[in-house]
């Protein structure tokens, strides 16, 4: 019986993206638990409490890390979706470009919200 | 030799109720993921922007959150986030070859669907409790 060994082709970035999508998911899951806990502890919520949560240095850094993880996670996920449904290369690459632009916009916007004033 | 490819009949079963639980979890994971990317995340960032910006902005949104329609949207958004969260945890376990057999995979899929709804109910309780 002849045995075939599969020769993987390509740049191997698929495996790396697959793994990083999962690592970023774990980062976001941790942050999610923190913010749910913070919201429950500060109940009933008011403006000073809301403001004080987001003025904590560690929470600002955590929020930024969350959005950075989200940027990569959503890029892989949206790219998967676009590759499944958009067959025309020009249309798909245009859509992918739009997704990347929007994600970078979210990242910069988050930084502006956290430290912009 | 190459003839034109035969046109095959296409049939898309778009009725999600026909899917087994793991299939339902999967397509809802995809739909919720896309919805979180747009428009839920920019809406969340906008609300964060306004509510952190000033007391007036905070009060404006606090008043908006009293509206039943807005509450419903928040509950739906929370359900989407929670479903994506728990379905994602299930995929992490499946990637580790935990619960990969047919029966446990179906059971975990049902658990994910239930936890998504329970989380949405929790958010509903939270919103009514802070008033």
Model-derived features with residue positions:
Chain B
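Membrane-embedded alpha-helical bundles that constitute the cytochrome b-like, heme-associated redox core
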Residues: 1-131
